[in-house]
């Protein structure tokens, strides 16, 4: 059976340091089969430049009409079997969140 894949979506517009903290909490995961899709509405605060170079992070910048439009746009970029939305400033509680989630999904 193939390993479950996750798409973690973060939508933002000028999020400041919150974006990096959210992305870092995902990068700290022990489970490795995920992508991070950052859908940016046109930030000018330099927050995108703070993101580390990592092949699991993909950034898409395109104007949107608000958070829900941004979420809908982001869905066209995801490739994972399961999608999780995180707001800027949200953190995954510990480094095993995706591991536990994958275990639950595999039992279904």
Region roles according to the model:
Residues 33-42, 60-63:
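Short beta-strand/loop segment that forms part of the nucleotide-sugar
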Residues 91, 95-108:
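Conserved donor NDP-sugar-binding/catalytic core segment of glycosyltransferases
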Residues 17-20, 45-53:
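Acidic helix N-cap motif at the loop->helix transition within catalytic regions
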Residues 61-78:
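Glycine-rich, basic loop-to-helix element that forms the pyrophosphate-binding segment
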Residues 19, 67, 86, 92-97:
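Hydrophobic/aromatic residue at the end of a short beta strand that borders the catalytic acidic motif
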Residues 40-49, 87:
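A conserved acidic beta->alpha catalytic loop
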Residues 83:
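Short aromatic/hydrophobic "clamp" motif used to bind/position activated sugar donors
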Residues 1-28:
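N-proximal low-complexity "stem/linker" segments adjacent to membrane-targeting elements
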